[in-house]
């Protein structure tokens, strides 16, 4: 902006350079890792694998595949999610006993749209389930480690 090429951060120049639909974009081709590998890495690190903002990415048709791969939860509450999206995602989570999360997707004050912290959150009851799930996974991991040590000692 200081050089005079544009008068706004997210405008015509930004779209020309960074929109995937622009013929003049500077974007490098993106190579995404295998979803199953990512889920396994998350679990291996002791994490909980949650599908981020499917309403924004419109990847509802891939959710069943992700569940089979070991998905633990879905971000249900997101600024881009409509009431219908929230209802559908909630139903999927209940059917498959998945965790339900939410968040504002705040990426700083210089986003293409104004989203403030705390505008979209995980309801307390689901936050409690998330914390309980994490504790349950830790207990199961400790139990498995103790059993492995006991079995190794028998050898």
Q: PLM features: what roles do these ranges have?
A:
Residues 3, 39-40, 44-48, 55-155:
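Charged catalytic cores and adjacent phosphate/nucleic-acid-binding surfaces used
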Residues 1-50:
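Conserved acidic, metal-coordinating active-site core of Asp-based
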């Amino acid at each position: 902006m200081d050089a005079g090429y544009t008068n706004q951060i997210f405008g015509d120049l930004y779209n020309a350079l960074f929109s995937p639909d622009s013929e003049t974009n500077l974007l490098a081709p993106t190579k995404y890792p295998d979803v199953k590998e990512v889920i396994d890495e998350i679990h291996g690190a002791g994490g909980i694998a949650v599908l981020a903002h499917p309403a924004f990415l419109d990847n509802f048709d891939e959710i069943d595949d992700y569940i089979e791969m070991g998905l633990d939860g879905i971000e249900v509450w997101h600024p881009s999610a409509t009431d219908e999206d929230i209802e559908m995602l909630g139903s999927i989570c209940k059917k498959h006993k998945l965790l339900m999360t939410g968040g504002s997707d705040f990426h700083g004050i210089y986003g293409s749209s104004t989203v403030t912290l705390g505008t979209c959150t995980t309801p307390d009851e689901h936050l409690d389930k998330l914390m309980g799930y994490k504790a349950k996974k830790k207990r199961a991991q400790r139990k498995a480690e103790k059993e492995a040590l006991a079995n190794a000692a028998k050898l």
